[in-house]
Design a protein with these regions (language model features):
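Loop-centered beta-sheet repeat module
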Residues: 134-188
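Outer-membrane beta-barrel translocator domains and adjoining extracellular loop/strand segments
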Residues: 26-33, 47-49, 80-85, 136-143, ...
Length: 264
């Protein structure tokens, strides 16, 4: 993994995180509409190189800045802090990474900043990103398989709206919450016509988390609650997906998902 920031000047910063893997992570699927909509895997996307982050930031004011590109989606505790030094186990927290994409990164635009001082200090992020793809939802991993990136292009038909707020007023303490909303996950499907008769299929995710660190102790806790509308209708469609697609056919898909955990 190669991660870096390049500062053009005091206002413009380029950030990137690039992965080099021998497994050909840059392969992608495409749909051959001239062959009855068959799925085919292609390697033109990049072979062994994959981008986890690649964005340009315009620094305007401590309380308001703008970033655009391929961004980490700050929903939950682990996505923002997915490096191994940020959890005690040998793998990422299972509850969070089972029901949400991890690491979750999408194309989009973000505004962020810090405001307040002393005991009233906060930071925030607000993003519009490519929404989750309903084709990838299933029984075992809920919406984790809906992250964009399987295909050569991402679908931005129904974007995801993300907001996060962190309280930073006490040294060593961080209390945060985030919200995700996509109005119609079915519209982001690679075959959206299969969901049209069910109308909009909205998804809402709420999270709360806490971290405390000093030289003697480190403690973390988080909770996630998600609600997927029309889960029964979605299950009936996903249960009949093509066997050649990159998706599973494991249904039924849960209407609600909950995860919580902590470590000290």
């Amino acid at each position: 993994v190669l991660a870096f920031d390049y500062k053009f000047n005091s206002q413009w910063v380029l950030g990137a995180e690039i992965e080099f893997e021998a497994g050909g992570t840059g392969s992608a699927y495409e749909i051959e509409n001239t062959e009855n909509g068959e799925y085919e895997m292609e390697v033109e996307k990049g072979g062994e190189v994959a981008l986890e982050q690649f964005h340009i930031t315009r620094l305007i004011h401590p309380a308001f800045n703008v970033r655009a590109g391929h961004l980490i989606v700050p929903v939950g505790l682990t996505n923002e802090h997915h490096e191994p030094i940020n959890f005690f186990g040998t793998s990422r927290p299972e509850g969070e990474t089972t029901i949400l994409p991890s690491t979750w990164h999408e194309n989009g635009i973000e505004v962020f900043g810090t405001f307040g001082r002393g005991y009233t200090r906060f930071n925030y992020q607000a993003l519009v990103v490519a929404g989750l793809n309903a084709n990838g939802f299933d029984r075992n991993t809920w919406v984790a398989g809906g992250k964009q990136g399987l295909f050569e292009t991402d679908n931005f038909t129904s974007p995801g709206y993300v907001a996060r707020l962190n309280y930073l007023g006490v040294p060593g303490l961080k209390i945060g919450g985030s919200f995700y909303y996509c109005h119609n996950t079915g519209a982001n499907s690679d075959k959206p016509e299969t969901y049209v008769k069910y109308g909009n299929i909205p998804l809402r995710i709420y999270t709360a988390d806490l971290q405390y660190k000093n030289k003697y102790v480190t403690a973390r806790a988080n909770m996630i609650y998600g609600n997927l509308s029309k889960a029964d209708d979605l299950s009936s469609v996903n249960n009949h997906q093509s066997g050649g697609s990159p998706y599973t056919q494991t249904t039924p898909i849960a209407k609600r998902a909950v995860s919580y955990g902590g470590e000290v």
